[in-house]
Amino acid sequence: MSKPISMDTTKSMTPVHVISPANIEWQTDDAGNKVPVSGEFGDVYFSQADDLAESRHVFLVHNQLPTRLANLIPKQCFTICELGFGTGLNLLATWQLWRQLRLTHPHLANARLHFITTEKHPVPFSDLAKILAPWAQRAPELAPLIEQLLASYPPLIAGCHRLNFIEDNLTLDIWLGDASDSLASLDGVVTTQRPYINAWFLNGFAHSCNETLWTERIFSQIQRLSRADTTAATYSCAGIVKRGLQSQGFVIKKSKGFGPKPEMLTAVMSEMSSLDEPISALSNKAPLSNYPNNTVVIGAGVAGLLTAWTLANRGISVTVLDKDAPLAGASGNPRALLAPNMTPIHHVYEHLHSIGYLYSGRLYRYFNQQAAIQKSPLILEQTGTLDLLVKTNIGTEQIADYPDTMATTISTEKAHDISGLKDKDLAHNLYLPQSGLVNPQALKTLILLHPNITYQQLNITNIEETQDNVILTGFESNENNESASRNSVAITTDHVVICAAYESHQLDQRIVKCRTIRGQLSWFTPTAEQMSRLPKLPLKYSGYCAPFIGQSSDAQLNHISENQPQFLLGASFVDGDANIDIRSEENQQNYDKLIEDMPELSSVLPNDISTWHSRAGIRTQTIDYHPLVGLLAQSQRLWTLSAMGAKGYALAPICAEALADMMLGCFTPLSAVTLARLSPNRARLHKVQKSHKRSL
C-alpha cells in the first residue's frame, strides 16, 4: 500500500508548520526485490509486483470511478480526496484512467478532475524519483505522467501546493502537514454552491502500524466534506474504521480484497440501506445552473489578465475591458522581479507570499513551454536572486529550515562569484534559486491569444447587477483614453470581476478605497565595459536591480531596443501619490539607493542620469497588506481581485485560482483562514473606512 499518515490528536488545532520529510529505508522483500519502507511507521510503501493493480482494484474500481468519471457532463468537476499521498501511485493510476476516458469520451473535453491529497511526511524528490523509476518501466502508460509529476513536485514546505496539468484538465492539490489540519483548511466559500468530495481514498496502513490515523477528528472532517452520494474505499477493515465511518452517516460494506487479502471496505454517505444500488442511481451531476458561460474582467493589468486566463482555462468565455491598453498601469514595467517575501518557517502554512510565489513559478514555467512552441519570448527568465536584506527580514539561521531548492544561504565566495560584486560584504545572504524576471509584455501577449479571451478598450461608467445577469455600460476610448464616441456601449454578462487596482472603489464602493503608492523605475543601456562590472543577476537591497536583454515585444510598452542589454533599478516609494509623471529626482533616488548599498558601483553607473529611461506606476495596497479576493457583499455576480501591492506577479496567479474556484463551487488552494484574510468584505477594512469618513 502507498503510505501511512499520522495525526497527533493530543496537540492543539495549530497546523504543523515544519515538515519532516519521510525517512525512506530500502529493504529486501521475500522475493528478493528492493522495496521502500517507511522509517516512521516500519512498513512497506508498496510491493514491487502488484501495488498498481491493487491501487486500481481498491480505489478506482470500488469507488466506481470508471463509470462515474465517464458519466460527467461538460464543465463538471469531480473531486477526489486522498489521505496519504505517499509515492503518488494512487494519483498516477487515477490520472491514467482519466486520460484514457478523455480519449474515448469526447464530452469530457471540458470536464475537470480535482485530486486533493494530504501528506504529513512527504517523500523527498530524490527518493520519489528512485521509487517511481521502476514503474515507468513496468507500466509504460505511467511514464509520461511520472515525468510531469516529478517536474512539478514542490519544495517540501507546509501548506497547499497546486499543480495544474492543463492539457489533461487535472488539478492536483498537495496539502503538506497533518491531515486533520489540512482537511480542516478545506473550507470552500459558499457562493453559488458548496464544494464537496465525490470520492475518498482512505489510504493508510493497518491500525496496528499507525494508531493515530483513524481518529474522531478525521472522521468528522470526512463527514463535513461529503454529501449524500460521496463514496469511500480503504484497505482497512479494522473495527475502528468501520465504526468511525458509520458514526458519520456512511453505509459500509465489506468487499473482496486484492489478491490474497480476504477483504477491504467500501462506504457511501447515503440514506440508502446498501451499496447494491448501481452508481447511476446516485446523483453524480453537481448542479451547474450557476456555472457562468461568460464573464467580464475589468482591468487589463496582471490581476485582470491572470483572472481572465484562469477562468478561460475552465471553459468560460472571458471579455477583458480596460479604458487603457493592456498593461498601461503599474503592471507594465519592463520586467517584474519574481521573488518571495520570506517568513520564518513556522508561519509558512498561512503565508500567501510563499505559496503564491511557488505556484506562480510553476505557472510561468508552463507558459515558457507554450512560448517556446510559438517561438515567442519567454515569460520567466529563471535567473536566481540574491537577497541582501536577509538579516532585516528573517535571519540566516531561519533559512536552514527551508528546502535548498526554495531558499538557501551560500558561501561568501560563491555569492561574490554569482553576483559579480567584489567589495560588498556578502557573508549574510539569501539565495533564491527559483526566482527570476517576468516579461510582462510577453505574458500579456500569450494570455490574450487564449481562444476564450477577447479584449476591448472600454471605459466602464456603470455596473448594474440583476437576478439573472450583470449589465455594464460605458464608452469606447482611444489610445489616449479619450472618448471616441458618446454612444453608450452596453454589455450583458453572467459575472463581473473588478481588477481595476485603486480605481476599483470607483466602480463599486463596496470595494474599500485602498492606499495609492507611487513607484518609479529607472533603466539604461550599459556599455560592454559597464555590463562586465554590473551585477550579474537580480539583487534585492533597500531597492532592487536586475540586468536583462531587450526582447522583440518590449518596445510596445517601454523604450527598450531588441537584443540590447539593459540595467533596471528601482523603485521609488511615494505614499498617497497617484501621479504618474516622470520625475528626475526619483531617478536620482534609485541611483542613490543602489550606490549607498553597493558603493563599488559608483564608478560603473553613468554619471549623467538624465539619459535614463523611466516608468511610473501606482501600487494599490490595503491597510493590512492583504489583497482583495472574492465575492462582494450582498452580491451573487460581482467579484474583485485587486490590491496586490508590489507583488502582483507573485500573488495574482494563486489568487486567480482561488477566485475561479469560489465562483465555480470548487475547493480553493488557500486555507479557510487565508480566504478570510483576503475577503473584500473583511470587517477591519470597512471599519477603518467608515471611521475615516466620520473624521472628514
From Swiss-Prot:
Catalytic activity as recorded in UniProt: 5-aminomethyl-2-thiouridine(34) in tRNA + S-adenosyl-L-methionine = 5-methylaminomethyl-2-thiouridine(34) in tRNA + S-adenosyl-L-homocysteine + H(+)
Cite the Pfam families for this sequence.
DAO (PF01266), Methyltransf_30 (PF05430)
Per the annotation, which location comes first and is thus the protein's main one? cytoplasm
List cofactor names only: FAD
Enzyme Commission number(s): 2.1.1.61, 1.5.-.-
Which GO-annotated molecular functions does the record name? Answer: flavin adenine dinucleotide binding; oxidoreductase activity, acting on the CH-NH group of donors; tRNA (5-methylaminomethyl-2-thiouridylate)(34)-methyltransferase activity
Q: Which InterPro entries match?
A: FAD-dep_OxRdtase (IPR006076), FAD/NAD-bd_sf (IPR036188), MnmC-like_methylTransf (IPR008471), SAM-dependent_MTases_sf (IPR029063), tRNA_MAMT_biosynth_bifunc_MnmC (IPR023032), tRNA_MNMC2 (IPR047785)
Kindly state which keywords UniProt assigns to this record, in alphabetical order. Cytoplasm, FAD, Flavoprotein, Methyltransferase, Multifunctional enzyme, Oxidoreductase, S-adenosyl-L-methionine, Transferase, tRNA processing
Write out the GO cellular component annotations: cytoplasm
Q: Where in the cell is it found?
A: Cytoplasm
Q: Which GO terms describe its biological process?
A: methylation; tRNA wobble base modification
> Could you tell me which residues belong to the region FAD-dependent cmnm(5)s(2)U34 oxidoreductase?
298-696
Q: Which NCBIfam families match?
A: tRNA_MNMC2
Task performed by this protein: Catalyzes the last two steps in the biosynthesis of 5-methylaminomethyl-2-thiouridine (mnm(5)s(2)U) at the wobble position (U34) in tRNA. Catalyzes the FAD-dependent demodification of cmnm(5)s(2)U34 to nm(5)s(2)U34, followed by the transfer of a methyl group from S-adenosyl-L-methionine to nm(5)s(2)U34, to form mnm(5)s(2)U34.
The record's similarity note reads:
In the N-terminal section; belongs to the methyltransferase superfamily. tRNA (mnm(5)s(2)U34)-methyltransferase family.
Q: Kindly provide the name given to this protein in its UniProt entry.
A: tRNA 5-methylaminomethyl-2-thiouridine biosynthesis bifunctional protein MnmC
Please name the source species. Answer: Psychrobacter arcticus (strain DSM 17307 / VKM B-2377 / 273-4)
